[in-house]
């Protein structure tokens, strides 16, 4: 790509005459919604950029905002030394890339330069030894074509602007229920801020005076600020984008609030109106700015030295080139050094990883299938289920299936006697029904009394802590109790955790509940119908069973396993729960699906459609606790004789399965010191130890999403790195089930993958830093200290095993589909969004032919050809 092309790309967006909301919506593509940390949902930080090639987005992000979307070269070289990258794939990727480029120089010259860049992280000192080098570089400069905020060119003012925004955002977005809240919050962020800012003591008298006559309408204020700052129409989108990326966490919270309120950009207009209004007030005395408008020029001396040193070009050769030829060479070298070499190393790493996975699947030891399956278990696709499923299948005549952990139920849930509801489905799915826990009224009343008594202590403590006068007395009153609590939690965490759980359970004594499965009128507050109609009950059960290929040969016992986690003193607890259930445990959904599948009316209708569930088959609900790899029973209805035998056999096997799965998992955690003597006890200690920063690895290490029959991967040690979604193409002649998997679970898997990827490659920006120095703020998220951006990603401890070693491999998700090639072609032709992800390199796609076993690679991040099958993988 030439320098001239770069200039055109960054200035081609003509915004003149477009409505303000459209401009804000366009700028908002640069950020992603940020959910409150209490229901942590993996977010794809670049979901608005998927219309661009991954490499082009990385180029723009680095040039304009200084954000790297690739791992540093040291990470690639370390992976190479460990055998995680095959150098053959590096060379193969280089040749493929060169074949597709319009090169500004002869092929052999470009190849020498690029290969040198690939294998050297710095230009050697001797390359700068030519005396005329500096003189040649002086007249040739490159600079990033960026539209930067006015305030960013005034360093101290930029810091003050961020401090002001953090202060006001903390006040407005607070959900902690504090005693003192921001007045007039109900009128919106801009209105509440506008009425108070004129008395803000952190602003000088002159700065407060500048707000005199400032618009009270947010739309007028944003337009007025852009005008006063002198932003040209064609630069407005880029200017707003830069402001959103200055504090992407708080801006992401504004996006989430807007979406929750049903207003796509209203909250962002509020946010930007406040930010740009403050910016003008702080920068007004310095306007207009003179000098470089779009940032500092970049020195090209290292690039020039590289050309001379690695290609053999001489100063005389350089002088004979025309100016545009010099620019083209420098732009080529600059882009390859900053972006393309990283991209080729990343692709080579991904190719190596895929080749290893292909070999493992192709050479697997085929486990003998049991003559009669005792139990079938439905697990979430979560990568943490893979080791547990593998050990369970080896322990007896048990089959496992994988599906999204919400079990295809678009519901919001309300636990017994609660005013709160939770959307227990993926963030990309809108709830259509509400399911409630219910119990006899005579049992609910005493339960409410006991529960409220237990909560009263916590609420009183919180209110006293937030009260001006009571807060002074609190340390004296609570000191002895908190001292004992601290001692117990620190010296005997396992014992203390058991005592606290037992006490809570004993005091509350929650009655046995049933579920509101059957339809009746909608709720007054949410408008959603409570329960499901008979047709909906049948459809949801059928849809899941068909999708995972479980339509016949039912075992006497079918276990529906949600999953959750147990940790202590962990702000990121919800990040370890089920993402498909909106960041909470999947127990509720498991109970609902099992109950639906046991309904005689549902089974009768399913039988009419060819899905015959035997009378002896019973569905039961369980929960896989990933922190301790334990299966806990949630609801076990009366069992048939055959189901009871299967149940007893499964229970007997679970102890060893848990021990083996924990042993495998504990060995990956740092500071365990090899294989622990009692892996179950070690896992349980980590779950209740409030000083433990890594109770488990979560979904770190995820790299692939497999869609196909379990028989293809059964017995393969996938190391807890692969999402496993059951699918049988033979039960899906129209491809509808595959399309649902791609649109739902696979998309969520991609979000999770890119959340971990971003937190690994740009931890300072997309991660959340050191877990031990974080502060929970406003009940919505975490900050570093008491005045930072709202941190949107994962803590450093979630992706690294030490300060010098990554645990998570930053690879883009590989989706593998077991289906004939025409299924994949149909999917790509009908699903333009998924096709765009593949074409532009935001995920990778391969397929396995179910008849021949051939492994086929689809798509290419440079050629944009969905049908390319190259790189030698699967041939």
Curated annotation (Swiss-Prot):
Sorted UniProt keywords: Cell membrane, Membrane, Metal-binding, Transport, Zinc
Keyword Cell cycle part of the UniProt annotation: no
Entry binding sites for Zn(2+): 380, 382, 563, 578
Protein's cellular compartments: Cell membrane
Topology class, membrane: Peripheral membrane protein
Keyword Disulfide bond: no
GO cellular component entries: plasma membrane
GO molecular function terms noted in the UniProt entry: zinc ion binding
Record InterPro entries: DabA
Entry cofactors: Zn(2+)
Subunit structure of this chain's protein: Forms a complex with DabB.
Summary of the function given for this chain in its UniProt record: Part of an energy-coupled inorganic carbon pump.
Family: Belongs to the inorganic carbon transporter (TC 9.A.2) DabA family.
Protein name, entry field: Probable inorganic carbon transporter subunit DabA
The species this protein was found in: Geobacillus thermodenitrificans (strain NG80-2)
